[in-house]
Design a protein with these regions (language model features):
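Short coil/turn segments at alpha/beta junctions that flank glycine-rich nucleotide-binding fingerprints
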Residues: 71, 87, 103-107
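Acetyl-CoA-dependent GNAT
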Residues: 3-76, 81-83, 94-96, 100, ...
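C-terminal "cap" of GNAT-fold acetyltransferases
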Residues: 3, 7-11, 107-110, 114-151
Length: 151
């Protein structure tokens, strides 16, 4: 499978469809739609939104960055359709997000995932993210696991 990665607007239709698919998958895994502490990402607070497209133009994955402070950002809405998993597209999206973070002068990326996402946990650990204490809105959440990587 070949793909390209493009920066898109947060309200891009393909991106919205991918985020809806991610929400549906997470709702199923967690048994409800109440699995994300804090405010959901929005066009007002997302600095970078990337979409991975197959050679025929089908949007297969996405990921975003939300600035936390002058030196760090949070990875949000990382998602790859089931058909694209294991193809390397998630790693390519994450590397592209890391490159975008470096270009903005951010030296640290953080993220939140959860215990019902063992595949995501394995992926982030394989990509060099290490577990950290819960931060921000995730403090006290029994559904959150947080990770960080210094770029």
């Amino acid at each position: 499978m070949t793909w390209t990665i493009e920066e898109r607007a947060w309200d891009d239709a393909a991106g919205e469809a991918l985020r809806a698919a991610q929400r549906a998958e997470l709702d199923s895994r967690y048994g409800s739609d109440d699995h994300e502490p804090g405010a959901a990402p929005s066009a007002a607070d997302i600095d970078v939104f990337l979409v991975a497209l197959t050679s025929d133009g089908h949007a297969i994955g996405c990921g975003a960055l939300r600035r936390l402070d002058a030196r760090s950002a949070e990875v949000k809405r990382m998602y790859v359709e089931p058909a694209g998993r294991g193809s390397g597209v998630a790693a390519a999206l994450l590397r592209s997000l890391e490159q975008a973070a470096r270009a903005r002068g951010w030296t640290t990326l953080r993220l939140e995932t959860g215990p019902a996402q063992p595949d995501a946990i394995r992926f982030y650990e394989r990509e060099g993210y290490r577990p950290i204490p819960l931060y921000g809105v995730y403090v006290g959440s029994g559904l959150s696991l947080c990770y960080e990587r210094t770029l």
